[in-house]
Structures are given as C-alpha cells and as structure tokens.
C-alpha cells in the first residue's frame, strides 16, 4: 500500500505523462505537491521500486509503468466522470438525421473514434435478450423467398433463402404457421432451445420429409444469434498495438464475446489495463460502458486504445457519448411508437 502523498505523486505523473508523453521530473511535481524536491524524489524511487513507475532512458524523469496505470485506474479513476467541455462537441456531432437504429450506433462509434484517435466498438442489445415480435414469409419467385423478422417490435432482420425443391406453397404456409405458433414472442435464447427440442417434433406433424425443413429453420434463424457490431477506427490500432489486434478486429463476433466478458455480472462500466483474456487485447486498454437502448435493454460502448491513454478524458467521452446516444435513441423509439402525421 502506498501513502497518500505517493498516491498524489503517481496520479500527477499519470496526468502529466498522458498529456505530454514526456517523462516527469520532481521539479514539475513540486508545482502541485507541497513537499521538497528531495522528498518527492524519494517517493518516486519508492514507487519505482514497487513497479508503479519506470525510468526513462533519455532523461532523469519517470513515467508510469503498465502496473502504475492499472493502480491509477483501480484507485483514482472515477468511471462516471464527465468533462463539460466535451458535451457541446458531442451533441453537435450527433446533430444528424437518422433513418434507422444502425445509423445511430455506427455514427456513435465513429464519433468516439474520431474524438480519441483510438478504436471504438458498439454492440446492440445482446442477441439472447431480444424477442421475436414479428414474422412473415414473402415469396419472391418460384424458387426463392424472404423471411422478414422483427425483434423487440422495432428491429427488422431479413433472410433470403432458396425454397427447398420438394416444397409446395402450402409448405411455406406451414413453415410460417409453426413459427407464429411456437416461436413468436419468444426470446432469441428460447428460440435456440426450441429449435433443438420442440420444433423437430412439431415438424413431423406437418411434413413427410423433415431434414430439409429443419435445415431451413436453422438457416433462417441463425441470423438472430449473431451480434450486431459497429467498429470504427480499426486502422488506429496499428498506432498503439501490433498487427494481431488489427486482425482480431475483423472477427466481429469474437470481438463482441471478448467485450462482453470484460464486464462482470451487474457491472455498468469497467476499465481493463493490459488485462484482457483475449491475447490480441492483452497489451492494450479496454474501456467498456453499458448504455440504455430505450424499450429494449442495454447496448455496449467500448474504447480500445494504448495503455498510456488519457483515461480521464476517455472515460468522460465514453460517458457523454453513451448518454447522448441513449437520448437520441429515446427520441427515435418514441417517434416509432407514436402516431405519424405530416406537419405542414
């Protein structure tokens, strides 16, 4: 455990270093820390011995080690902090017309990436928690059709498929009827379970040959089990990490799994400093924050960047963007649920 003065010194070194990326000497600390230069140097030496500070090769100053940044995050960083100077810029960036949910999530991801210079990832509500609230089949031709699904009464998902060779028109009607009777109003996780248990038994009552029918069910509904992921600033990862991080960001489903695992049960926000279970994220920092998607649940807003990032500003931007995005989504869903009328 370090003393209060040593904690203040570490915090100040972290603050100064993340602003300038230059080693910090005792004279720079004396302007804020009410102690002699010798006392400050002695405390810096103790912090270095504890592995929280590192010597610079080109100067007598010190800089935070990865362990030092982690200590700062765990003991001094407020995860709910907001810098009012950033509020105006975020609100201004969100001043655009959105025609669908994906527009807003993609825009928010770009805003966070552009304002930090790092990589941002936004996830929609976890698939397992969404509900199937609408289903229809539109026959496009003699040989293909379109399954139109609605999640949470607002999110459309479409899957085009080739009609099985042995299907007649009545078979498509039966397919739709089974979905409406057994799967409609179920959560996605329940649909996954029913496709393995109930549906095979039900299908036998409607179809003589069931193999291609069960394959059709799997094909149509597999889309529901995928995370909706929006990545921005992927190329920025090359400035603070190696190629493995850049390549990992291409695997959006695995990215989503890793980010969800970074939050413990019941947590609304977390900061991992070189502490991810995923090897491609093991040498970076990951900020993760839940934001409200009204009427549906929580999305996930994440920032991936270097260990020596400005944590206070990064946390502030994540918080502000999360709040502004939630407000924008609230307006969007209220509009969808209201009576539409034209204003002249």
Swiss-Prot record:
Record key words, sorted: Repressor, Stress response, Transcription, Transcription regulation
GO biological process: negative regulation of DNA-templated transcription
InterPro entries referenced in this protein's UniProt entry, alphabetically: GAF-like_dom_sf, HrcA, HrcA_C, WH-like_DNA-bd_sf, WH_DNA-bd_sf, WHTH_HrcA_DNA-bd, WHTH_transcript_rep_HrcA_IDD
Domain of life from the UniProt record: Bacteria
Transmembrane segments: none
UniProt GO MF annotations: DNA binding
One Pfam match: HrcA_DNA-bdg
Family designation: Belongs to the HrcA family.
Function text: Negative regulator of class I heat shock genes (grpE-dnaK-dnaJ and groELS operons). Prevents heat-shock induction of these operons.
PANTHER family, per the entry: HEAT-INDUCIBLE TRANSCRIPTION REPRESSOR HRCA (PTHR34824:SF1)
Protein's UniProt name: Heat-inducible transcription repressor hrcA
Organism: Streptococcus pyogenes serotype M3 (strain ATCC BAA-595 / MGAS315)
Gene: hrcA
């Amino acid at each position: 455990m370090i003393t209060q003065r040593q904690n203040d010194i570490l915090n100040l070194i972290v603050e100064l270093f993340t602003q300038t990326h230059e080693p910090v000497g005792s004279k720079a600390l004396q302007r804020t820390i009410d102690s002699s230069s010798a006392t400050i140097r002695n405390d810096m030496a103790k912090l270095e011995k504890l592995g929280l500070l590192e010597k610079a090769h080109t100067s007598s100053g010190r800089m935070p080690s990865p362990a030092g940044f982690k200590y700062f995050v765990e003991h001094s960083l407020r995860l709910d902090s907001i810098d009012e100077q950033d509020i105006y810029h975020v609100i201004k960036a969100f001043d655009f017309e959105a025609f669908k949910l994906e527009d807003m999530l993609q825009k928010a991801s770009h805003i966070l990436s552009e304002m930090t210079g790092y990589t941002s990832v936004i996830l929609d509500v976890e698939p397992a928690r969404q509900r199937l609230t609408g289903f229809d089949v539109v026959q496009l031709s003699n040989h293909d059709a379109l399954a139109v699904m609605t999640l949470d009464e607002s999110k459309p998902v479409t899957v085009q498929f080739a009609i099985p060779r042995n299907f007649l028109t009545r078979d498509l009607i039966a397919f739709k009827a089974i979905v409406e009777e057994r799967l409609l109003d179920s959560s996605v996780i329940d649909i996954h379970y029913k496709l393995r248990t109930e549906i095979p038994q039900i299908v036998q009552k409607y179809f003589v040959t069931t193999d291609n029918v069960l394959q059709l069910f799997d094909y149509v509904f597999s889309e529901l089990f995928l995370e909706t992921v929006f990545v921005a600033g992927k190329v920025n990862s090359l400035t603070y990490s190696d190629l493995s991080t850049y390549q990992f960001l291409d695997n959006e489903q695995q990215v989503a799994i890793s980010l969800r695992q970074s939050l413990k049960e019941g947590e609304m926000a977390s900061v991992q400093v070189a502490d991810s279970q995923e090897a491609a994220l093991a040498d970076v920092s990951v900020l993760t924050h839940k934001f409200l998607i009204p009427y549906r649940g929580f999305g996930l807003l994440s920032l991936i960047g270097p260990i020596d990032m400005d944590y206070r500003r990064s946390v502030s931007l994540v918080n502000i963007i999360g709040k502004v995005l939630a407000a924008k989504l609230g307006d969007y869903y209220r509009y969808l649920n209201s009576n539409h009328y034209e204003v002249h």
